[in-house]
């Protein structure tokens, strides 16, 4: 099943590498090269996953992730942060602001494709559990009536 993925990176080579590899998996890709463009694209397309570079020309990925988490329409979209910044602190800060996962550059495409697949499956399972709980709640209410 095709999923919509927003790739946010100001390096065209990285965007094209990700586009090629993720389209092999049948995904539909959109891209943005700045923070403002990323926020606009996220609101417009409501992607299933956002791949977000931390270092963009107008704002950092941490700030973008925080903004996404504060808006009802984008609050639950999984974000995988992409960065060359190794170390525990940037990774932990990413999780603090709401990132779902973290991938170091240079990007190993097979690894990233698996991370995307995993995040999508986790979201689908969570949504199925919520739907099952709602159906169960409705059934209980109907039995009480």
Model-flagged regions — what are they?
Residues 16-24:
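Charged docking surfaces used in two-component/phosphorelay signaling
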Residues 45-51, 56:
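Active-site beta3 strand of CheY-like receiver
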Residues 9, 53, 83:
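Active-site residues of response regulator receiver
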Residues 122-145:
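CheY-like receiver
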Residues 106-116:
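C-terminal output helix
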Residues 26-33, 41:
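Short hydrophobic/Thr-rich beta-strand motif most characteristic of the beta2 strand and flanking loop
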């Amino acid at each position: 099943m095709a999923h919509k993925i927003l790739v946010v990176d100001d390096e065209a080579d990285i965007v094209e590498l990700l586009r090629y590899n993720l389209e092999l998996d049948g995904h539909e890709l959109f891209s943005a090269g700045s923070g403002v463009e990323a926020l606009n694209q996220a609101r417009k397309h409501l992607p299933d996953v956002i791949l977000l570079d931390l270092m963009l020309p107008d704002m950092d990925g941490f700030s973008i992730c925080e903004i996404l988490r504060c808006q009802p329409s984008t609050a639950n979209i999984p974000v995988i942060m992409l960065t060359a910044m190794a170390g525990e602190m940037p990774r932990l800060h990413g999780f603090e602001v709401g990132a779902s996962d973290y991938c170091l550059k240079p990007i190993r495409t097979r690894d990233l494709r698996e991370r995307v697949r995993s995040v999508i499956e986790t979201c689908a399972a969570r949504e199925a559990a919520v739907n099952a709980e709602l159906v169960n709640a409705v059934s209980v209410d109907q039995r009480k009536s």
